[in-house]
Curated annotation (Swiss-Prot):
Protein name stated in the entry: Arginine deiminase
Annotated active site: 397
InterPro entries on file: Arg_deiminase (IPR003876)
Molecular function terms, GO-annotated: arginine deiminase activity
Localization per record: Cytoplasm
GO-annotated biological processes: arginine catabolic process to ornithine; arginine deiminase pathway
The family this protein is said to belong to: Belongs to the arginine deiminase family.
Organism listed in the record: Escherichia fergusonii (strain ATCC 35469 / DSM 13698 / CCUG 18766 / IAM 14443 / JCM 21226 / LMG 7866 / NBRC 102419 / NCTC 12128 / CDC 0568-73)
Pfam families reported for this sequence: ADI
GO CC terms, sorted: cytoplasm
Length: 407
């Protein structure tokens, strides 16, 4: 029976979610390569895995189905067409040369699908291929150089794809370190039995083209419900990407308006959900910088001719209130004094995952903000994040909802 895939809000009952447990890709994160791979630090992989297990089990205990990306990818590789497509896209003739690439693909094709999935996310070094594969390319590389670089940011399943009402955007990622992630998700959504033949829309990102500056990441996309989508214009999500997604949503009659808000272009504000999440019907968790009156905000609507009508909004909060039909948005700001609030925002105090209205999962270390949630009537299910938090992502970043009720 085909599973239902629909995300109608940020706060309706969460029913199914995709996570990725830390694995080989994080073991290959080092002080010398972590910046290139978009991490600020190296993690204790074993401890991060334990913390992730607690996160996953917290969701399961709430009756939420948890699917793991590595399992989905392994099962997708059982389909020969999917396996061949992934090998062709991840082991490119143009990057490795046709002879060497052909030999590496042939060797990988003989692996168990579990091991192949492990390398598709964890990377492959020259030292791991058999000595029988000889080539000029091999001769000019060290054994610890990567044939396929690891994808440690797969941990943040929110970004690579995001479900919006009756469809999914498979996102063209902004940074080279993350762009190969998209092909793993494209294969899963195209061939895995859970999704193949499903009656859902692919809005954006599932074509073999260079998306250039039209990049989009799911951490910037909030499905606030009632036909509205809120998108942050960040260092990762561009106006071009937002326009393409908005046009697709309107074409398929899946949204009535898209609210675009300009974010500061710095690391601590990498995505909208690092500074703002929807946690109850009228309630948002925010780091105050994003709701300043001088922040640029627009509402996009269909112009009736296949294009977009753009309306400048006076404030982000006013735009949200109009979209949701509420009198006033209630804000819960990051807790503590100025120093504590900055520290807790950095440690993802605002990046909580809402399970149902007024119930969220967040890192236990953010004591000041969690106390404010509690006083405001929001239930926090705490999870450890001393290691996971080093990746600069919280519970929302680490989850891709596949089925969630509307409001």
């Amino acid at each position: 029976m085909m599973e239902k895939h629909y995300v109608g809000s940020e706060i309706g009952q969460l029913r199914s979610v995709m996570l990725h447990r830390p694995n080989l890709s994080l073991k290959r994160l080092t002080p010398s390569n972590c910046q290139e791979l978009l991490f600020d630090d190296v993690l204790s992989v074993e401890r991060a895995g334990e913390e992730h297990d607690i996160f996953a089990n917290t969701l399961r205990q709430q009756g939420i189905e948890v699917l793991l990306l590595t399992d989905l990818l392994t099962q997708t590789l059982d389909i020969t067409e999917a396996k061949n497509w992934l090998l062709e896209t991840q082991i490119s003739d143009y990057r490795l040369g046709p002879t060497f690439a052909t030999d590496v693909r042939a060797w990988l094709a003989e692996m168990s699908h579990r091991d192949l999935a492990r390398h598709l996310s964890g990377g492959l070094t020259y030292g791991e291929i058999p000595a029988s594969i000889k080539n000029m390319v091999v001769d000019t590389h060290d054994i610890n150089d990567f044939i396929m670089k690891p994808l440690p940011n797969h941990l943040f399943t929110r970004d690579t794809s995001c479900w919006i009402y009756n469809g999914v955007s498979i996102n063209p990622m902004a940074k080279p370190a993350r762009q190969r992630e998209t092909n793993n998700l494209r294969a899963i959504y195209r061939w895995h039995p859970q999704f193949a033949g499903g009656e859902f829309i692919k809005y954006f990102g599932d074509e073999n083209i260079n998306y250039d500056h039209a990049t989009l990441e799911g951490g910037d996309v909030l499905v606030i419900g009632r036909g509205a989508v809120l998108i942050g214009m960040s260092e990762r999500t561009t106006p071009q990407g937002i326009e393409f997604l908005a046009q697709a949503l309107f074409k398929h009659r899946q949204a009535e308006r898209v609210i675009a808000v300009e974010l500061p272009k710095h690391r601590s504000c990498m995505h909208l959900d690092t500074v703002m999440t929807h946690i109850d019907i009228d309630t948002f968790s925010v780091y105050p910088e994003v709701v300043r009156p001088d922040v640029n905000c627009w509402t996009l609507t269909p112009d009736g001719h296949g294009g977009l009508k753009r309306t400048q909004e006076s404030t982000l909060l006013h735009a949200i209130e109009k979209a949701l039909g509420i009198d006033q948005v209630r804000l819960i700001t990051t807790g503590g004094d100025a120093f504590e609030a900055e520290r807790e925002q950095w440690n993802d105090a605002n990046n909580v995952l809402t399970l149902r209205p007024g119930v969220v999962v967040g890192y236990e270390r953010n004591i000041w903000t969690n106390e404010k949630y509690d006083k405001a009537g929001i239930t926090v299910l705490p999870i450890p994040g001393d290691e996971l938090g080093r990746g600069r992502g919280g519970a929302r970043c680490m989850s891709c909802p596949l089925h969630r009720d509307g409001i």
